[in-house]
């Protein structure tokens, strides 16, 4: 059993070594992050198990459904390339994944995504995220609030949301963000 993530694999040589060991059968099980799904060549994968896909599906992003489904399609493509393969998915959204994966309805998914995005999201409207970061949490929040007020007065820009970033503190700095939308890229 080997870990396959960015904490464990820091160089291209480490990556090649683990892939070679796995492809030779010296490693039976790889446990890792999304990094496992990214374009690496694995032989003889007969089982892929996906845990926590709902955290991607439930992200606060208009791209969440697309990211989750795309990741599962990538992972599914790893299993059974040379022979039989199986994919087990842990999810509370079985209907969504069954419909678009088992019934090969990816084209239908793309059409429904375009329809969903048509009124509010790219590629039909433009979006931007402004991130504020500073060691002084009060100062940076006040700065974000100041810009929110300015931006709300701009008739060409809609302030979709603002507040603490999902990862509120990083590298000893507090983080806030503003999400903006406009039909005019220059306004953003």
Walk through the language-model features, giving the residues of each:
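Short, conserved loop/turn and helix-capping segments at secondary-structure boundaries
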Residues: 62-69
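Accessory helical-bundle/CTD segments and flexible terminal tails appended to RecA-like ATPase motors
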Residues: 1-3, 11-62, 74-188
């Amino acid at each position: 059993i080997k870990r396959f993530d960015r904490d464990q694999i820091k160089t291209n040589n480490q990556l090649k070594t683990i892939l070679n060991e796995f492809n030779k059968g010296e490693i039976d099980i790889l446990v890792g992050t999304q990094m496992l799904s990214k374009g690496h060549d694995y032989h003889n994968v007969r089982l892929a198990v996906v845990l926590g896909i709902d955290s991607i599906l439930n992200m606060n992003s208009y791209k969440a459904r697309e990211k989750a489904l795309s990741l599962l399609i990538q992972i599914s493509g790893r299993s059974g390339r040379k022979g039989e393969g199986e994919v087990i998915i842990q999810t509370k959204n079985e209907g969504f994944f069954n419909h678009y994966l088992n019934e090969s309805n990816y084209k239908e998914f793309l059409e429904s995504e375009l329809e969903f995005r048509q009124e509010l999201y790219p590629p039909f409207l433009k979006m931007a995220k402004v991130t504020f970061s500073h060691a002084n949490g009060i100062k940076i929040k006040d700065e974000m609030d100041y810009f929110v007020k300015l931006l709300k007065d701009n008739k060409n820009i809609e302030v979709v949301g603002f507040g603490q970033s999902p990862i509120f503190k990083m590298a000893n700095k507090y983080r806030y963000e503003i999400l903006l939308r406009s039909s005019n890229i220059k306004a953003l």
